[in-house]
């Protein structure tokens, strides 16, 4: 039931975000959104023109939740090295402690990206690029500040980290086995040590 103080548009976005993140974009229908929000088609179309528009708003909402978790954790870190480890831990936490039901919205939408509406596919790419770019920035900052020296390109290290954790999230959730995720986290942290040697 919609909280009285919550605007209807926000209610639709929040309910749709959970649906898209659990069922997937293609499997989620307007009827599903109507059932979750307890609104009729006209009540939804008062705010959105179509399912694609709802999906875009829902992903933006989900992505902001991801960013909020990163910010709250990263505020506790002082060095780039600490921030890189926090990024790894936050990404891993999305499997069994997601910011929204269904797992990491960035990873989930990326799986569907090749088949998505172009605007939504662009959102998926931008989300993934923003994540990897942030890691690259932390690697560069750490090197400039003399915390460590990277033996590979920032792009390669960041892409490897994200790819490994994305795959581990999927495997761990599919098998409902958190230990497999812990293995991947340890592997990525070891990879970071091997390729970002401290002076």
Where are these regions (language model features)?
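C-terminal peripheral helix-coil segments that are non-catalytic and often amphipathic
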Residues: 2, 86-94, 129-141, 145, ...
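Short hydrophobic/aromatic patch on the recognition helix
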Residues: 38-48
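All-alpha amphipathic helical-bundle segments outside canonical DNA-binding/catalytic cores
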Residues: 82, 122-126, 144-160, 179, ...
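Amphipathic alpha-helical segments used for helix-helix packing
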Residues: 83, 97-119
């Amino acid at each position: 039931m919609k909280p009285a103080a919550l605007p209807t548009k926000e209610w639709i976005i929040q309910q749709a975000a959970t649906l898209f993140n659990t069922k997937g974009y293609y499997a989620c229908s307007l009827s599903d959104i109507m059932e979750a929000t307890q609104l009729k088609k006209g009540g939804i179309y008062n705010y959105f023109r179509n399912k694609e528009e709802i999906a875009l708003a829902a992903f933006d909402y989900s992505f902001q939740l991801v960013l909020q978790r990163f910010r709250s954790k990263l505020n506790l870190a002082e060095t780039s090295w600490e921030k890189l480890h926090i990024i790894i831990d936050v990404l891993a936490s999305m499997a069994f402690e997601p910011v929204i039901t269904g797992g990491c919205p960035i990873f989930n939408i990326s799986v569907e990206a090749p088949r998505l509406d172009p605007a939504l596919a662009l959102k998926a790419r931008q989300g993934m690029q923003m994540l990897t770019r942030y890691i690259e920035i932390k690697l560069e900052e750490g090197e400039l500040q003399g915390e460590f020296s990277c033996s590979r390109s920032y792009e390669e290290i960041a892409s490897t980290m994200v790819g490994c954790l994305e795959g581990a999230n999927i495997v761990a959730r599919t098998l409902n086995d958190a230990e497999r995720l812990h293995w991947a986290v340890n592997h990525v942290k070891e990879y970071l040590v091997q390729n970002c040697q401290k002076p």
